[in-house]
Amino acid sequence: MDKLVILKSIGGNFERGFQCSLSIATEGQPIDLKVLGALPAHHSLPEDYRTWQATCRNLGLRSRISGSGTVRKGATRSDCVRASEHLQEQLNRWLQSPSFVPIRDKLQEQLQPRDRVRLVLQVDDLALQQLPWHAWELLDRYHNIEIALASPTYQAVKQSPPCPKPMRVLAILGDASGIDIETDRVKS
């Protein structure tokens, strides 16, 4: 069965935490249920993300002396893997917070491993968007899941009215070699 799951953060930041809502619907149908929960403050998670990014960005760079005279070493693959594992561990620990349990429980209750799931994360906090949501351990049991980011605010786009007459296309194909077309260009 195709399911649409919308996880929305309602304001907040990593200093204060995030209020969240979860909506689940069968694809093409109205929302079946809505659950509220919260993610607590987690000051170090954005820094863990930046550390992982910086470590992997420096992957394979040679040691070099910076302007201050200190030697900076490039990161190794194992440094990058360690930073990635640490970030994933912190993310999953955060997503197991007691205040987020109602959302986790409802996901496990409503979704079956064989379901095709579209998980839409409606978040406005850039740092929250950048987290590796695909590494959420809860999602490992769903083999047919897509994760998408979306803005929590949106407006429907009006469709253009259809053309009253069918469109006609004229295409002239040819080769101008050997023909003096300069006089035609000047006249038009």
Where are these regions (language model features)?
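Glycine-rich phosphate/diphosphate-binding loop of Rossmann-like nucleotide-binding domains
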Residues: G178-D180
